[in-house]
Amino acid sequence: MKTYPFLLSISLLLVGASFSCKNDESNGLTPNSNSIELCGVKNPLKNLTWLSTEIQKFGTGESSQRLNGVVLYEYKGANVVEVQCGLCSSTNIHQYKCDGTLYDFTDPNIFQDYIKNRKKIELIFGTEIWK
């Protein structure tokens, strides 16, 4: 009979540990995303209106984080917020300035220079799908 309380204790410990290890998927955010500062704004996924709107297009939940991403790069001394969508083209139309306006990387040579010389700063949301 001594094994029953032991097994029950182990089972409860494992169940408790599995729930405590979850990230903040309930609101669709990457762990620690609330502590990130981007473009001078804390918690940019909620507080940068244009970025919040883009994130809402992804939906919520675990699949949203696996299929989409927001990555902060530095390019020529400026922040570039790259919104990576699993269902979108990986072309040069998803790179934003801090104010939400698109960078003009339509010239293939400029886009290749961006790809070659950008420096990854931080994954802001989800998964970096376009490396």
Segments and roles (model prediction):
Residues N27, L45, T91-H94, D104:
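Secreted/processed peptides and extracellular or luminal domains of membrane proteins
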Residues L38-G40, W50-E54, T127-E128:
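Hydrophobic protein-protein interaction segments
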Residues Y103-K131:
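C-terminal partner/receptor-binding element of secreted or periplasmic proteins
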Residues A17-V41:
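Bacterial Sec-dependent N-terminal signal peptides
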Residues D99-G100:
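Residue-level signal for glycine
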Residues T49-Y96:
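Mature extracytoplasmic domains of secretory-pathway proteins
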Residues M1-F19:
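Sec-dependent bacterial lipoprotein signal peptides
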